[in-house]
């Protein structure tokens, strides 16, 4: 029986083209592969039981996949492949209980997210936004009021040493700064080999000039960066959130920024997405913001689609996909 795959429509550009380009789709049309595919005709925010009854595999970007998604009487789907590394939008256990596996793209995202974190750091350290304004507004003589920060005498703190955290330490090492890492689940020798020092989260918050979060969102990491931990940071330090919005208590962060408890922040993610029009962060000139897409590049999406669609192809051929998310 032909394996039928649906791709969520939010993976299309406004012009109707695949956002990741056409080349990865060639994986679904290999000679000898009994598979057909389509972009799902409906635009949905949650995968419905009807869709789970229609397709053998679904490639998902932002729509949620919940227990309700697999509650229908005619469940056909056997694999949900996430276009991305995070899977907080997927009820992995509920799917597994129904015999549906979940995959993600942990390898493809490592370099792009790490580069995006460094983009925030370099822009904040170099005072890029205000210097752009000075130039455009003919305020040239004010430039000595906005001295940037050199990095060789600073400390980078990385919270979470998974694939992205490791890649970030690797890319950041040539700057010659001190690098701290907080992750109780990673062997200290791994961190040392990357040039970092393993410390507690509290010590990392106290000592770092730039704190970068790269952890997955779950009940244990929700509001991991709270008011108490923000209060530990240097007044000259910056927080960079590249993970998920709820990793940081956003109200506590706003309070810390207003009070001058920390110097600023770079945020690619928010507790509410899209960000509300009245969110105070939008009016803060010491905060850089991106719409959960700073790592999005042509290479990033191409590699993600290859990895994610590759999982579906492997499954359709009776092979075990490389990046199955374990429930629980």
Where are these regions (language model features)?
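Glycine-rich Rossmann-fold phosphate-binding loop(s) that bind the pyrophosphate
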Residues: 161-162
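Rossmann-like dinucleotide-binding domain for NAD(H)/NADP(H)
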Residues: 102, 236-328
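Rossmann-like adenosine-cofactor binding region
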Residues: 65-70, 185-280
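N-terminal Rossmann-fold NAD(P) dinucleotide-binding loop
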Residues: 165-166
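N-terminal glycine-/charge-rich "phosphate-binding" loop or analogous flexible N-terminal tail
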Residues: 1-55, 316
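Phosphate-binding beta-alpha-beta segment of Rossmann-like dinucleotide-binding domains, i.e.
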Residues: 98, 106-155, 170-174, 324
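Short beta->alpha connector loops at strand-helix junctions that form conserved
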Residues: 83-84, 100-111, 183, 201-202, ...
